[in-house]
C-alpha cells in the first residue's frame, strides 16, 4: 500500500465516529446473543457440565488464535474490510450455534465464533484508536460503552424473544437481521485504512512498553472475569445469599461499568487520563477490599458496584496508551494488548479457583485487589 493511498484512507470525522460506535454495538450484540442459547445447546447435544465447559473453551481458543493476526490484517486490508468480513462470518455462524447437534460440529462452530469475535474486537479497537486520535479528545470509553449496551440488547433481546415463545433459530435469525442492517449502516464510513502500513511478518511478539500495557490489561480483564465467574459464588458461600439472588452481584457490577463507560469520555476530558486511571484502579481495589472485609451481603454488592464503576474507564485509557506509544505500530500494539488482556479473562478465573482451593475465596479476591493496586501505581507512567 503506498503512502499516498494510506494517508487518504485515514481521515476520520463525525461519520467515522458513528460507524465506530456501531461496530462496538454490533460486536456486543453478537457476542451476548449466544448466552441465552447455551442451555439449548447443552440439552440438544446432551452435554454434562464438564463437557459443556470444555466445549465453551473453543470460543476462547478461536479468539486467542485470531487476535494476534488481526493487526497485520487491518494494515493490509484496512479496518473496514476486516470488520465487515468478521461481522459477516459472525452473522453466518450464529445460526449454526443453534443447528449443530454433535460435539464435533459444535466445537467447529464455536471456534469460528470465537475467531470472528476476536477479529472484530481487535479491528474495531484499532479503528477507535485512529478516530479518537484524530478527534483530539477522549472517546474510547464511549466506544466501549456501546459494546456493553450491545451486550445488554443482545442477551436481553434474545431472552425476550424466547420468552415470547419463538424457537431459538427464529430468535437468533432476528438478531442476525439486525446485525446485517447495522453493518450496512456502518459500512460506508468504516476506515479503509488502518493508520499503519505493514509489510512485515503476520505476527510480532509484543515488546517493552507494549508488553507492560498488555500486563495491565491482563489485570483489568482478570478482575472483570473474577466478577463474572466468582461474584455469585462469593455471595452464596461467604455471605449467605440464596442462589436465586446471587446474580445481583454481577448485575450491579455490569450496570455500574456500563454507566461509567457511557459517561467516561466526559469524565476523562474533564479530569484527565492520569486521574481517571489512578482513581478508577483504586476504586476497584477498594471495592474488592470492602467486599471481602465486611461480613455483609449488601457491603459485598456495594463493593462489586465500585469495582465496575472504577474499572469502567481503565481499559479504554490503556487502549489509548497503546495507540499513542511509539515502540510498535499502533495496530500491532492494539492486537497484542487485546490478546494479552483476553488471556486474563480465560486464565484469571481458573487461577482464582486454584488460590481459593489452597486458602479461601476471600484471599483469592484479595490477590486481585493487590494486582489492581499495581495498575494504580503505574498510572503516571502510562499517561505521561
Swiss-Prot record:
Q: Which positions, given as ranges, span the membrane?
A: 22-42, 52-72, 81-101, 106-126, 143-163, 164-184, 202-222, 240-260, 276-296, 299-319, 327-347, 352-372
Q: Name one GO cellular component term.
A: membrane
Q: Name one GO molecular function term.
A: transmembrane transporter activity
Alphabetical list of Pfam families matching this protein: MFS_1
Swiss-Prot/TrEMBL keywords: Membrane, Transmembrane, Transmembrane helix, Transport
Q: Where would you find this protein in the cell?
A: Membrane
The UniProt entry lists membrane topology as:
Multi-pass membrane protein
Q: What is its main location?
A: membrane
Q: So which domain of life are we looking at?
A: Bacteria
InterPro entries linked to this entry: MFS, MFS_dom, MFS_trans_sf, MFS_Transporter
Similarity field: Belongs to the major facilitator superfamily.
Q: What is this protein called?
A: Uncharacterized MFS-type transporter YPO1221/y2967/YP_0917
**Organism for this UniProt entry:** Yersinia pestis
